[in-house]
């Protein structure tokens, strides 16, 4: 019977699948960490812009509201 798998073949296949899953998980984790760092950098830039422009925004709002 040529189609019958032996226990060793199944075990090797499972082990290969586990190794592939671990590699994919590691790659995904590294990619997620990089994306998280990029998002943090962008949020920091947004905070800086908001802080520098907030004073001007408030002045304009007060002037318009006071007119």
From Swiss-Prot:
The pathway noted for it is: Protein degradation; proteasomal Pup-dependent pathway
User: Positions of the region Disordered?
Assistant: 1-26
What domain of life does the UniProt record list for this protein's source? Answer: Bacteria
Q: Which UniProt keywords apply?
A: Coiled coil, Isopeptide bond, Ubl conjugation pathway
Which GO molecular function entries does the Swiss-Prot or TrEMBL record give?
proteasome binding; protein tag activity
Q: Where is this region: ARC ATPase binding?
A: 23-61
Q: What is known of its domains?
A: The N-terminal unstructured half of Pup provides a signal required to initiate unfolding and degradation by the proteasome but is not needed for pupylation, while the C-terminal helical half of Pup interacts with ARC to target proteins to the proteasome.
Q: How does it assemble?
A: Strongly interacts with the proteasome-associated ATPase ARC through a hydrophobic interface; the interacting region of Pup lies in its C-terminal half. There is one Pup binding site per ARC hexamer ring.
- Please give the name of this protein: Prokaryotic ubiquitin-like protein Pup
Organism per entry? Thermobifida fusca (strain YX)
Gene coding for it: pup
């Amino acid at each position: 019977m040529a189609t019958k798998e032996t226990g060793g073949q199944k075990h090797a296949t499972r082990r290969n699948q586990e190794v592939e899953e671990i590699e994919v998980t590691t790659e995904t984790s590294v990619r997620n960490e990089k994306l998280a760092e990029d998002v943090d950098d962008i949020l920091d830039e947004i905070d800086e812009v908001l802080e520098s422009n907030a004073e001007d925004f408030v002045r304009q709002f007060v002037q318009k509201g006071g007119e």
